[in-house]
């Protein structure tokens, strides 16, 4: 059953954190625990999105907001709670900044040579990602990410968030569990 699996999972995460502590590498190890987007409401009450509305495959916050726990003793203050906007791909430049490469996003935009096991290649790409390190360590009060684009599982743009404002372009009006996956989104004439 679901409950037993979660209890077992929690125990395994605890064992891993204990091992990191026992090895004396906690202050040199960033642990990020996260999930994918929103639960399926058909697993209620286990798949709740409280206080957010709805579930996966909708345009509502319950489909996109997720818990994320971060542990880095000595760098990130324990017990901190944040509702700032971040995305999973923000971890790429954040981890590299923690490892001593704080400017990877700018370098990749300009074109950056990377040696991959003796094979040197140039990568020139734009990554929609931000280094979260100054925010996570308390150097700045806000996340560098100010906006978020909401996509459906078919890559349709459902909405756009900027700070606390959200514009919805397509809405999932179906109420309920698996039927949500069968019903199309309703395009709005005006957001």
What is the role of each PLM region?
Residues 3-6, 57, 65-69:
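Catalytic cores of eukaryotic secretory-pathway lumenal/extracellular enzymes that build
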Residues 1, 21-30, 61, 159:
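Active-site regions of oxyanion-processing enzymes, predominantly non-cytosolic
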Residues 32-34, 71, 168-170:
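Generic beta-strand/beta-sheet core signal
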Residues 4-7, 11-14, 18, 93, ...:
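Solvent-exposed, polar/charged alpha-helical surfaces in well-ordered, non-transmembrane soluble domains
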Residues 8-44:
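Metal-dependent active-site segment of extracytoplasmic phospho-/sulfohydrolases and closely related
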Residues 39-61, 76-80, 84, 89-191:
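C-terminal cap/loop subdomain of S1 sulfatases and analogous C-terminal strand-loop tails that border
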């Amino acid at each position: 059953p679901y409950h037993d699996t979660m209890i077992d999972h929690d125990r395994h995460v605890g064992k891993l954190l204990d091992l990191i502590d026992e090895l004396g590498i906690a202050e040199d190890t960033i642990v990020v625990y996260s999930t994918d987007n929103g639960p399926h409401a058909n697993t209620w009450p286990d798949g709740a999105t409280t206080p957010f509305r709805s579930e996966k495959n909708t345009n509502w916050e319950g489909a996109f907001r997720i818990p994320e726990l971060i542990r880095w003793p000595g760098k990130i203050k324990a017990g901190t709670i944040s509702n700032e906007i971040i995305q999973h791909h923000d971890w790429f430049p954040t981890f590299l900044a923690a490892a001593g490469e704080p400017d990877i996003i700018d370098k990749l935009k300009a074109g950056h040579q990377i040696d991959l096991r003796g094979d040197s290649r140039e990568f020139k790409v734009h990554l929609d990602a931000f280094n979260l390190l100054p925010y996570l360590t308390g150097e700045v009060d806000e996340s560098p990410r100010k906006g978020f684009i909401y996509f459906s599982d078919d890559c349709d743009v459902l909405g756009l968030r900027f700070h606390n404002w959200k514009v919805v372009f397509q809405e999932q009006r179906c109420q309920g569990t698996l039927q949500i996956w069968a019903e199309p989104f309703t395009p709005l004439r005006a957001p």
